[in-house]
Amino acid sequence: MRLTTEGLEASRLLKKGREELAERVTGRYFERRPQWEKSCKHARQKCAEDTRHHLDYLSEALSLSRPAIFADYVVWVAALLARLNIPGEALNTHLALLRDTIADQFATAGSSLAARDITMHYVDGALAKISQAVPEVNCFLDGEGAFDILARDYLEDLLQGNRRRAGQRILAAVELGSSIHDIYLRVFQRVLHEVGRLWQCNRIGVAQEHYCTASTQMIMSQFYPKIFSTERKGRRLVAACVGGDLHEIGIRMVTDFFEMDGWDTFYLGANVPVSGVLQQIAERTPHVLAISATLSSHLQAVADLLAAVRATANPPRLLVGGRPFNALPDLWKDIGADGCAGDAAEAVAVADGWSV
């Protein structure tokens, strides 16, 4: 991993002072913008929460020597706030206060000048990036092919709260000859990406987003009699979301693809602690461990888990995936993995390549 001493020092100080920094930044923010606190009942609480998120992503970026982790997160926040009609100046002010407050706290804590400077550099880089135009996120369901139309109709059913019709639509497509692989990748995956985009655009709420995800998981389960009937090939997979990550549907799809490829799989679900993963590796002796991370704030947890697995007597191959790895294609090398995959089909292809 391409780590730096000053980055690790800065990350450690941010984690140690997280709560105090959040409170100090929030206090300074409302000293400058008292009208914002008056206009929203929970403004101070929300500001402190947002500050903690900023600190978490900044800490991850510093610990992995990856300024793009924080910069990309800030651009995402800027896009979200723009669609909520919150002026961009609010985020600029917030980040500038964050930078100055960190500098003050680092000086008080006796940090090295290098640790302070690299932190300021990361924040200033993110500020410079959001001064550019915030890119639009295009619809994931464009096109007029059969699967494009099916995906749009399926999403419309879910947004109307009609899970039964959505499921019937998918089952009918399979009966007419569509493969489960295509349904997963060309319908479910794209629809869930579109659901995320709609949430970011403030067109649906968290409850609708969760409903769409839960409904899709339920519909996926109807395919399990077929998925688990594939001829076995004598290879084993353990799959899980890293501790703290509650977004499990992606790694569930990956696990199902391995099952359809003939692997014996052991799916551990979301938010699995290191001890739980190590226990399963000892008991199942898998050939591959697949770990998913949805947010960049979980990357250090992934690195810690992979290091713990590598320290075991006979570690499996380590495969990672998730949004942070898609955004930074070579990140998996720095984090200690053996490979990375952008979707379920690629994950199986990578793992099958290791068995040759």
Specify the residue positions occupied by each region the protein language model found.
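Core of compact, soluble alpha-helical bundle domains
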Residues: 1-96, 100-174
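Amphipathic, non-transmembrane alpha-helical secondary structure
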Residues: 75-78, 96, 171, 274-282, ...
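Long amphipathic N-terminal alpha/beta scaffold segment
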Residues: 104, 141, 163-164, 172-251
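Active-site-proximal alpha-helical scaffolds that flank and shape metal-associated catalytic sites
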Residues: 122-128, 132, 240-241, 249-264, ...
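Cofactor-cradling patches in redox/metallo enzymes
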Residues: 255-260, 266-333
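Peripheral docking tails and interdomain loops at the edges
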Residues: 324-356
